[in-house]
Amino acid sequence: DEDNDGTIDRVSIWADNLPACFGICPARGGIIAVCSPDIIYLADRDNDGKAEIRTKLFSGFKVGIIERRMNSPQWGPDNWIYIDGGQGGTITGPFLKNPIKIPTTAFRIKPDGSAIEPVSGHTSTYGFTFNKDGDRFVISTGTPGIQVAPLPWRYLTRNPDIAVRSSRRNAADYNTTFPSSKPHPWRTKRATDPGFGKYYRDRYGSAESIPNGFFTSACSPLIYTDNALPGLSDQILACAPAQNFVHRAEIKREGVLLNIKRLNNKTKTEFLTSEDIWFHPIDLSIGPEGAIYIADFYREIIED
């Protein structure tokens, strides 16, 4: 927007002809893009505004249900890049000595493509977040946050005789929501349809069969690790695009567990809500000045 009128005046295409890309991460003077079935490194070395370097670092990830594809690459506290989703597979790459089998869990990579390995826990939609201590939180459609077990995958798998039921646990004991928008008419119609309503109740419970009031599309959690916004430090935010709000909660350590609780004075409100049913926050990030940036997928319907 060169004249500040709120309308795009010029568009530059830096890279194209990629598979559907569900996240990018800066690395090695370029970016790493996750676009199933590949993880691709892109860079512009001659400064002409186009990425002439394109290297497939890893290949072999499944291309299936959209919300299960690998997504949200970000640097971890250990200088690996963490990526969630992907549904596993036998992964190959030009810088790997041998193919690596990745189960249906999250994983981490070296940015030069020399290593890839599973990590504990996985998200059920999009996104995950770290706190200052390196604890990782993932998310599902029906809860604002899930704590990943503190034991790394590489330790759990050293003993093949140990049976681990799950490497993650629900950190929140609630799933109710308080949007300010009215549900879209299609959601109300779906809830009153006897066939569809029964299908959703039988398969997912009542939370998925009523127009709103419960998490159904929680995604993109973010623990605010800056101090520029008073009162938000170390709290967790999460998007709920289907109900047009951003959720906020605090993280409490209770013994060896980390639990998510609504703030005492915010028990029946959300951090950010809109009455505009086209407002669909889908991603959160912290800017260099400490502000929270929100990606709004502004369209009429989110089908969840």
Placement of each model-derived feature along the sequence:
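Beta-propeller domains with acidic blade repeats across secreted/periplasmic ectodomains
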Residues: 1-304
